[in-house]
Amino acid sequence: MKVLLIKDVKSLGKAGEVKEVKDGYGQNFLIAKGFAKAATHEVLKQYEAEQKKKAENLRFELANLEKLKEELSKITICIAKPVGANGSLFGGITKDEIAHALKEQKNIEIDKKSLECDTIKELGMHEISIKLGHAIHAKFKLEVKGE
């Protein structure tokens, strides 16, 4: 019998592959445990339609991420913090503060965990990197001013 694997099965194949297996193994184990479906014409057609939809969604998501990357590369945000007598910041600027400033100043919401920087403790311009997903990274400028 032919089955369409829904999940990866050790020693048989990866999800999405069509495999020829013995009837008992296919019916009693693979299909019963939810690892596969019988590879009928309708099931294969439905699987192909789902794959096309996933590919289209991925293309749309990648296009949006590239657009966001382009938008972020043109942005400079400014954060003002109190400074000491020697010109150094009290405390520092955290990822949370950077994400909040990006939301407040440019209306771009990002997760603070996607920021790739340490706590900033110096005045001046800094380049901040963001992981957007799907191996796409963006950079924007952060200006730290003293109050």
UniProtKB/Swiss-Prot annotation:
GO biological process: translation
Annotated keywords: Ribonucleoprotein, Ribosomal protein, RNA-binding, rRNA-binding
GO molecular function, one term: rRNA binding
Keyword Oxidoreductase: no
Cellular-component GO terms for this entry: ribonucleoprotein complex; ribosome
Matches recorded under InterPro entries: Ribosomal_bL9, Ribosomal_bL9/RNase_H1_N, Ribosomal_bL9_bac/chp, Ribosomal_bL9_C, Ribosomal_bL9_C_sf, Ribosomal_bL9_N, Ribosomal_bL9_N_sf
Protein's job: Binds to the 23S rRNA.
Protein family membership: Belongs to the bacterial ribosomal protein bL9 family.
Protein name (database record): Large ribosomal subunit protein bL9
Organism: Campylobacter lari (strain RM2100 / D67 / ATCC BAA-1060)
